[in-house]
Amino acid sequence: MALSKLNHLYMAVVADHSKRPHHHGQLDGVEAVQLNNPTCGDVISLTVKFDEDKIEDIAFAGNGCTISTASSSMMTDAVIGKSKEEALALADIFSEMVQGQENPAQKELGEAELLAGVAKFPQRIKCSTLAWNALKEAIKRSANAQHLTDQNVKEGKNV
């Protein structure tokens, strides 16, 4: 009986994130990372505002299934205020978790840990990881842009 109530609570939290997602929308003045899941049609546009190494603000828009939208919402809650390195570590922990690998650090995912059950549904793994993959791409692009800026400064070019 207790397990049934716990599962119901988990499902309610996931449904709430899907129906009323946190950090939904687009941020002005930052490049959007757009990814899609051709298997089911989920599409995400992720915008991230960095303050040097920290994620200052983050938002997502797009169309997706319940799992994709809830995961996107939970991801934004988990990574805001984190360093790029911390956010990448969380993305890796999440990816491993939804593939069935247990990790004590899963607790750091916050409510996103509730999506561990996705591992039982392999066809939904891509739905759950779409936003996390977009986050990895945004961090990669940010690092590349910073490298180019640093290189131009080193070479004495105007940026």
Swiss-Prot record:
Binds 1 Zn(2+) ion; this is probably a substitute for Fe-S centers. Belongs to the NifU family. GO terms for molecular function: iron ion binding; iron-sulfur cluster binding. Transmembrane segments: none annotated. Keywords: Metal-binding, Zinc. This is Iron-sulfur cluster assembly scaffold protein IscU. The keyword Iron-sulfur does not apply. SUPFAM superfamilies: SufE/NifU (SSF82649). PANTHER family: IRON-SULFUR CLUSTER ASSEMBLY ENZYME NIFU HOMOLOG. Its cofactor is Zn(2+). Forms a heterotetramer with IscS; each subunit of the IscS dimer contacts an IscU monomer. It comes from Streptococcus pyogenes serotype M1.
